[in-house]
Amino acid sequence: MIISASTDYRAAAQAKLPPFLFHYIDGGAYAEHTLRRNTEDLAGIALRQRILRNMSDLSLETSLFGEKLAMPVILGPVGLTGMYARRGEVQAAKAAAQKGIPFTLSTVSVCPIEEVAPAIDRPMWFQLYVLKDRGFMRNALERAKAAGVKTLVFTVDMPVPGARYRDAHSGMSGPNAAVRRMLQAVTHPQWAWDVGLCGKPHDLGNVSAYRGKPTSLEDYIGWLGTNFDPSISWKDLDWIREFWQGPMIIKGILDPEDAKDAVRFGADGIVVSNHGGRQLDGVLSTAHALPAIAEAVKGDITLLADSGIRSGLDVVRMIALGADGVLLGRAFAYALAAAGQAGVANLLELIDKEMRVAMTLIGAKTIADISADSLVQGLR
């Protein structure tokens, strides 16, 4: 398959992965309206083309939380990344470090903190869920700190798991799921060998380290699902803020009032996000939620965004809407599934090139030059 654009990796991933894994990363909640709107609404943002601006010294470099980035892109937390490629978290982290951007390890990664952190030459970020088992949360934070993690991404939009109907159809869950997954693996021999056999252990590395015994996909669906905490409130985050001395980012904000609460709480950053359309169907797309949040808190807190970003052009659009940087999820997972570390590295180069073309044609020499003035007003 020819990969000429960042968006080509989705089809390549579908050809490579067993259906239960492809549809797990590709799917969303309920009827997936928000999932579709994330990309559709972002694609509808019209950029304002400018000409004859002398764009010879263009730069994508930026700084977030005291860390220099080659471009305003972070590889965001994606659960079970190690099931898309052999030891997938390590491969993705290496590609990110090679490009000069951060990688964020998910709570529910296959590879544990202690395997990923030493594999790269820059501090990774770590994502943590709010769970009933506070002992696990403290253990994960202590281990992340010991591994040199400086930046914590705290996901707050998952007090309960989203209803992802596609998972039951694909074999990730539902009747006879284990048998269906095994049959799918047999019909995808390249994945079965490279990941299924050579990529073991297939457990939740961070959870296994805490529980002292191996975990499985059933634990991901079972133990983790019963551990999400619907009672969480801002006061429950106080001990984490006290414990974690580095930058703390609150991920999963869609409303300006919640963004203001994050500022009052003392968060260093927020991620405007609907969890990639995987939690509550029918909520605003990130592209439509971001401008009001930026108007409410821009300058008081670092603004990041995710959900629906598939290309360098999308990165430029999100920054014009008010973000200081973006997190990639599905986009890099597709590339990882298709071609491992090399696929992610190529994806990041494609995004770099796409950003440079877009910035040249809107007259923005630096990331700071991208603003609401870069958009055609009335078509946002």
Swiss-Prot record:
Recorded GO MF terms: FMN binding; L-lactate dehydrogenase activity
Residue stretches making up the FMN hydroxy acid dehydrogenase domain: 1-380
Keywords: Cell inner membrane, Cell membrane, Flavoprotein, FMN, Membrane, Oxidoreductase
Pfam families assigned: FMN_dh
Subcellular location: Cell inner membrane
Residues involved in FMN binding: 106, 127, 155, 251, 306-330
GO terms classed as biological process: aerobic respiration; lactate metabolic process
Broad enzyme group: oxidoreductase
Protein family per UniProt: Belongs to the FMN-dependent alpha-hydroxy acid dehydrogenase family.
Physiological role: Catalyzes the conversion of L-lactate to pyruvate. Is coupled to the respiratory chain.
Protein name: L-lactate dehydrogenase
Protein source organism: Serratia proteamaculans (strain 568)
Gene for this chain: lldD
